[in-house]
């Protein structure tokens, strides 16, 4: 089990959620139950899945939740592009979010790679012991 609050990726994802909520407050009220709700839920999903995965008992399970978090980041980016296309976001704001999301995606991929490597090494060690 990992201490998720100490993970830099979780901390950065939490910053993203705060920034997303601040920006979506300015969206039209007609979007409250539509795009705003979808964007906010998607943003919340990113650190939530990191935390849930960190609380699991194995690297393999953690990787599965990181993959869900990773997919949510692409979904969020798509929703933000839609928001820009319908003039709810400026290009500058979209670019700032895109940079934040890209950083999270890189961190997520790196963490998944480390966990997979660790998991694979443990499996190999067990096989070596059995032989």
Regions found by a protein language model. Give the residues of each.
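Short, C-terminally biased terminal segments at protein or domain edges
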Residues: 1-131
């Amino acid at each position: 089990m990992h201490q998720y609050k100490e993970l830099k990726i979780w901390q950065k994802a939490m910053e993203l959620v705060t920034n997303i909520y601040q920006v979506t407050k300015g969206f039209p009220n007609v979007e409250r139950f539509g795009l705003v709700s979808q964007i906010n839920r998607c943003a919340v999903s990113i650190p939530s899945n990191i935390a849930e995965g960190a609380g699991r008992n194995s690297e393999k399970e953690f990787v599965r939740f990181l993959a869900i978090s990773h997919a949510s980041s692409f979904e969020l980016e798509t929703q933000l592009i839609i928001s820009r296309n319908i003039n709810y976001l400026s290009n500058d704001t979209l670019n700032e979010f895109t940079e934040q999301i890209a950083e999270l995606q890189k961190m997520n991929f790196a963490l998944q790679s480390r966990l997979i490597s660790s998991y694979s090494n443990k499996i190999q060690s067990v096989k070596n012991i059995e032989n």
